[in-house]
Amino acid sequence: IDNDYGIHFYLKGLAYQDKRYFYESIKHFKLSGDLFSVRLPLDQLREMGEDEQILDLLAL
């Protein structure tokens, strides 16, 4: 179910262009163990200009 929430918040982040939803998406993808999909919100945050070091830490 965490993977479903990850997708939900990722799509919500795309719709609203709101960083909070991308961070929530990362949390749920990590809880589900889906290390492939976690890159989707990370890439969006990178495009939005988020700090590269923070994003690298979140990718671990």
Give the residues covered by each predicted segment.
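C-terminal non-catalytic interaction modules
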Residues: 1-60
